[in-house]
Amino acid sequence: MSDSHSHSDILLCQRCNKNHASVISRKEKFCTDCFRNFVSLKQRKQMMSDQYYQDIFKVMYKDKLRSEQDAHLQNLNSKILVPLSFGSSSLVMLDILNDTLLEQSITHRGKTGFTVDVIICFHDEQIQNQIKENVSKLINAKYKENNQKIKFHLVDINQFFDNSPHLQSLVLQETDFLIKSLNLKDQSIIEKKLTLSEILDQCSDRSTYQDLLAFVTKHAIKKYAFQHDFKAILWGHSMTRLADEVISLIVKGRGSAISSSLNTDDFDENYGNKFKNLYPLKDILLTEIDAYCYNSGLHNYLINYNIQDALLVNKINQNTDKIQTNSLKNKTINELARNYFEVIEGDYSNVISTVVRTGDKLAEPKSQENFKISKCNLCMQKIYSDPSQWITSITENKGHPLETDEEKENYQRWKNYNNDKLKNSEMDFFRLNEFVKENGSKACLCYGCTITLNTFKDKSVVWPVHDDKELNSVLEDYVLTDHEE
């Protein structure tokens, strides 16, 4: 008897006991169809997690609570927003939503309980053509039957600054770590940096860059949901992604935001209490999502993402043992946390689920005594204690006195160099500080954003004023179809 059979030939699916196994996950062997069902059921369970979400996703009929017309309107108005990044998670989540719509249409004779609007955010025009091409392929290959139920929208997040009615300059005072805000409406003396790229260019490290980009993207998505009356935003975050988010928030000094960021029960109060946020993939590991993505052919639509083949019986990556050459110094905090969870995901996946469950159990922090809860002018998170007071208490601001002639000479050189810079600049950090001290007003930044602002080249950033005018300023979108070029 020949021993030349591949490993997959001798492995049978433990669910159906018929087909060859293509995935091994949680110590169980799955064929492709059974694994798709396994992942799909976990997502659908989250979609039915409480009455609010059941009313969105179920097909409604006339009953004791609603008339036939009311049921029809509820089905029609059950709109959900799906952010698509073209990573594996958001593609898989959308694929399962598409399957759900197809099943509802067949079972309920053309009726469905909800519609899907997909939002794709970008700030780099170079990637725009690739996005359009992928969307066109997706519609034709995957979503042709649901082209009236699934719509794709492209949003340029540079509008974050372009369409903001009021801009402010947030400036960090180095001596006391207080934040001052300068209204730029009538301050033509200060250059307005209106594009996102200009703001991101001020970031001194990749962590700050990614944090700001993530916030602007999330704000654009939630603002779009607010303006178009969506019932819920479905975020394609895996259990692994949520775990690394929890750890990263703690490391960045944003631990107080964990409770609100994982909250799926309450309406989003920063956006008019109009919608809720749901994480349908929160019970699924990233490696499981990647396996689903590959076996379903969704890997052909990925942008800037590499599939992990850890759970696949037949590996797809030839250099699985290749050592990553990226320096730890060049990694963001989120990337470091993600790398850790990727390493332990195989043998210690319970650690990941424990982190997410613990984050879910965290309640909103209590405010510091005699401190009125406020909101951060930058990230909009609640502030429960005065960060500047705490930073000042642990910081030594007085320098060592100059003693030797060499120290005095070096100090004079430094002073002359900076004076020359001051003369050649219309409004650099030193002048801006003095100007803001006299003309600015006190602003509120959380601890995490205070630390972030400290990494900026001039300790300041131009930022929109988050108010009703900004929230209602129209966010333009471009509807993508199956014949985009």
UniProtKB/Swiss-Prot annotation:
Instruction: Return the GO cellular component terms, semicolon-separated.
Output: cytosol
Keywords, ordered alphabetically = Cytoplasm, tRNA processing
State the InterPro entries in the record: CTU2, Rossmann-like_a/b/a_fold
The answer to whether the entry has keyword S-adenosyl-L-methionine is no
Coiled coil segments of this chain: none
Native species of this protein? Vanderwaltozyma polyspora (strain ATCC 22028 / DSM 70294 / BCRC 21397 / CBS 2163 / NBRC 10782 / NRRL Y-8283 / UCD 57-17)
Location (main, coarse): cytoplasm
Instruction: Supply the Pfam families for this chain.
Output: CTU2
**One BP term from GO:** tRNA wobble uridine modification
| Metabolic or biological pathway, per its Swiss-Prot or TrEMBL entry | tRNA modification; 5-methoxycarbonylmethyl-2-thiouridine-tRNA biosynthesis
Say what the protein does: Plays a central role in 2-thiolation of mcm(5)S(2)U at tRNA wobble positions of tRNA(Lys), tRNA(Glu) and tRNA(Gln). May act by forming a heterodimer with NCS6 that ligates sulfur from thiocarboxylated URM1 onto the uridine of tRNAs at wobble position. Prior mcm(5) tRNA modification by the elongator complex is required for 2-thiolation. May also be involved in protein urmylation.
Instruction: From the Swiss-Prot or TrEMBL record, state where the protein is found.
Output: Cytoplasm
Which protein, by its recorded name, is this?
Answer: Cytoplasmic tRNA 2-thiolation protein 2
